[in-house]
Amino acid sequence: MYIDSHCHINFPELNEKIDEVLINMENNKISHALCVSVTLDKINEILDLTRKYSNVYASVGVHPDYEDIQEPDIETLFNYSKNEKVIAIGETGLDYFRLKGDLSW
């Protein structure tokens, strides 16, 4: 069995296809999925998915592409991590692959 360690099945373009995606995962021996948040305002959507699907887990954080969004503080991340379906912190860090220019923010 395999685990998809980084997916975004909460994105709007998959709203009508989540069941199909999860069936395809199972058919391809992917037993679990880690749905990674890109902004904290979407975490509740992801947590809803983790409640609906026993094989979906969550990662909480803010993707570095969203430098204009308030970064979460440690306490906020810690509070989310108390949920048994939150098993990772991320998106985080600096995305040197996509971002250009001054990265001092």
Predicted regions located by residue number:
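Mid-domain alpha/beta scaffold segments of enzyme catalytic cores
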Residues: M1-W105
